[in-house]
Amino acid sequence: MCIRDRLTDQPLRLHGVPDITDVRKILDIFRTLGSEVQLDEATRTLQLHHRDTRFDASSHRLPEEMRSSIMLVPPLLARFGVARLEDNVKGCTLGVREIDPHVDIFRSFGGEVERASGSLLIHSAAPLKAVRHWLDYASVTATENFVLCAVAAQGESMLTNAACEPHVQEFCRFMVMMGADIDGIGTSRLTVRGGAPLGGGDFTFEEDFHEITTFLALGAITGGDVEVRNSTPDNFPLIDRTFAKFGVQVEHKNGWSRALRSGPLKVQTPFTSNVLTKVEAAPWPYFPVDLLPIFIALGVHAQGNALFWNKIYDGALGWTGELSKFGAHVFSSDPHRVVTFGGNPLTPAVVESPYIIRVAIALFMVASSIEGRSEIRNATPIRRAHPHFVENLRSLGARV
């Protein structure tokens, strides 16, 4: 969200800003570009003003280690007519992360894209033009990049097969607060009437449903009673039903959520014969793919068998082999599907996490449910999404 405000030169105040590493990296980029940045860590309030920014494509390259840096291209293109992006923009190691959908969007709005010394130079001599575009896949970042370009372009643009995740909806509401004209928020078709200057203002972020779910799952796998405040129950109907597949009931009341189990975790048997209980992850409103690892952790600990299907990424399940070090029985059907055979006795182990945020958390979840000392190596990605993960765990009584 911090990136989106570069389309305005008016002051902005953002509330509820998470203290995560990606935010700090983005703010460092802003400072390099000459923006005024004030972050109050105690109140999680961020003040930004981009009135005196500067950009030189020959010296300013957007960082390749953050996938979100690709969303700096539209604001830079709109304000300076040029941006330079590494052609191997990374993120979590989930498999091939395509940039072609973004290139298609930049080109459709009138941008020219060319390779230059290991990077992509995106430039536009003329103002961006309104377009109609159809995504071949409902990508979150591609959807947001389209909206950023469309807001800057003169005229009415339309996107079909838009992503509609809660954070995409919040992003659109943020743009509307700044003065953007967007219809279809929360649907697969967005209409943006652009060209008007954007203003400043105040905006408060809602709590991340991924983090809420993570702590509910931690309570469920350990048998603890964890209450998460400032919850967002409107995002949870399908997540709640998925918890129920493992014998966990989720209660939402008065702004908080709690996961409850009356006995050991147990995979619920489907009414359909000859099929496994399954969790299918795909673009929203399907089950969120980012949450699949923590439910695989529940599946390992639960009695019974379950199928987990990642319909998006081709390299996001390779880590499940690490679970065997705990004594878990997990079968990889193909790059997109694994089956957990739960109920095996589990023992402490030393495991290694790939660079995937919630895989590190999933491995921790399994370890936390086993008596004894385990070690999760390469767990630093957790800080990219959970600013006070260890501190919160200790407040719940965990020895970390």
What are these regions (language model features)?
Residues 1-400:
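Short, structured segments at the rim of ligand-binding sites
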